[in-house]
C-alpha cells in the first residue's frame, strides 16, 4: 500500500510525512509513504493526503498549477473511492468554495463555504491558535477509539476560517472557540481535519493510524 502526500507548495510536508511514517510503524501492508508533485503517482496511490497552510485562494492556485493534479484527485477520490485525508486548508479545499478575501471555488466534495470564524467572546483572538478538545457529531471509523469530548485529548489548531458545511451529516466533530468550529468533516471515502494531526501528538498519530487502516 502506498500513501501519497501532495506537494503543491503549501503545507507542512516534512511534518506530515514524519507523522504518517510514525503512525504506520509496524503496520502490516503499508509499503511506502511518498511526497509527490506527480499526478500519476497520486493516481496510482492507495491513499492520498492533502496538507495545506495559508490562504484558500493561494492553495487552490498552487494545486491548479500542477498540471493534471485536480483531475487525478477527482478520479482517485470520487471515481475510484480511495481514502483521502485533507489537513487544515487541505480540508477546506474539499468545500464548495472559499470566502477568504475573495471567493474561490473548492473541489466541491463537501457542500458548504469556508468562512471566517466569529467567536461570540470578543476577547478571543483570531487566528485561533492553540489546543482544543473535540466534540463528536457522529461516528466514523477514523474516529474509532479516539478520546473525544470535554475530557478527551486536545488537537492543535491554527486558523482563521472554517468549513461551514451545508449538511449536518458531513460534520464528524466540532471544537468550541466562542462558538462551534468545524473540526472534522467526512463524506464517502474523504475525511478532513481543520486541526493539524501531525502536530497533535498522540491524539493526532492515533487519528492518522486509523486513517491508514481505514477500509471504506
Curated annotation (Swiss-Prot):
SUPFAM superfamilies: Class I glutamine amidotransferase-like. GO terms for molecular function: glutaminase activity; imidazoleglycerol-phosphate synthase activity; lyase activity. One of its GO terms (biological process) is L-histidine biosynthetic process. The keyword Cytoplasm applies. PROSITE patterns: GATASE_TYPE_1. GO terms for cellular component: cytoplasm. The active site is at residues 88, 196, 198. InterPro entries: Class_I_gatase-like, GATASE, Imidazole-glycPsynth_HisH. CDD domains: GATase1_IGP_Synthase. It comes from the Bacteria. Pfam families: GATase (PF00117). It is found in: Cytoplasm. Keywords: Amino-acid biosynthesis, Cytoplasm, Glutamine amidotransferase, Histidine biosynthesis, Hydrolase, Lyase. It catalyses: 5-[(5-phospho-1-deoxy-D-ribulos-1-ylimino)methylamino]-1-(5-phospho-beta-D-ribosyl)imidazole-4-carboxamide + L-glutamine = D-erythro-1-(imidazol-4-yl)glycerol 3-phosphate + 5-amino-1-(5-phospho-beta-D-ribosyl)imidazole-4-carboxamide + L-glutamate + H(+); L-glutamine + H2O = L-glutamate + NH4(+). Pathway: Amino-acid biosynthesis; L-histidine biosynthesis; L-histidine from 5-phospho-alpha-D-ribose 1-diphosphate: step 5/9. Its EC number is 4.3.2.10, 3.5.1.2. Residues 2-216 form the Glutamine amidotransferase type-1 domain. Its main location: cytoplasm. IGPS catalyzes the conversion of PRFAR and glutamine to IGP, AICAR and glutamate. The HisH subunit provides the glutamine amidotransferase activity that produces the ammonia necessary to HisF for the synthesis of IGP and AICAR. HAMAP family: HisH (MF_00278). Heterodimer of HisH and HisF. This is Imidazole glycerol phosphate synthase subunit HisH 1. The lineage of its organism: Bacteria, Pseudomonadati, Pseudomonadota, Alphaproteobacteria, Hyphomicrobiales.
Amino acid at each position: 500500500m502506498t500513501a501519497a502526500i501532495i506537494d503543491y507548495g503549501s503545507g507542512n510536508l516534512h511534518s506530515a510525512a514524519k507523522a504518517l511514517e510514525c503512525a504506520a510503524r509496524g503496520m502490516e501492508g503499508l509499503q511506502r509513504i511518498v511526497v509527490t508533485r506527480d499526478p500519476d503517482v497520486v493516481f496510482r496511490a492507495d491513499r492520498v493526503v492533502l496538507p495545506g497552510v495559508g490562504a484558500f485562494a493561494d492553495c487552490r492556485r498552487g494545486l491548479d498549477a500542477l498540471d493534471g493534479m485536480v483531475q487525478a484527485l477527482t478520479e482517485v477520490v470520487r471515481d475510484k473511492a480511495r481514502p483521502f485525508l485533507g489537513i487544515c486548508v487541505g480540508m477546506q479545499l474539499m468545500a464548495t468554495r472559499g470566502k477568504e478575501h475573495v471567493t474561490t471555488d473548492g473541489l466541491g466534495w463537501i457542500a458548504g463555504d469556508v468562512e471566517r470564524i466569529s467567536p461570540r467572546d470578543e476577547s478571543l483572538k483570531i487566528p485561533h491558535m492553540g489546543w482544543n478538545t473535540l466534540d463528536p457529531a457522529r461516528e466514523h471509523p477514523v474516529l474509532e477509539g479516539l478520546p473525544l469530548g470535554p475530557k478527551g485529548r486536545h488537537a492543535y489548531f491554527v486558523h482563521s476560517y472554517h468549513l461551514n458545511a451545508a449538511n449536518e451529516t458531513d460534520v464528524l466533530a466540532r471544537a468550541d472557540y466562542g462558538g462551534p468550529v468545524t473540526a472534522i468533516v467526512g463524506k464517502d471515502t474523504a475525511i478532513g481535519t481543520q486541526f493539524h494531526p501531525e502536530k497533535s501528538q498522540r491524539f493526532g498519530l492515533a487519528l492518522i493510524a486509523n486513517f491508514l487502516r481505514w477500509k471504506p
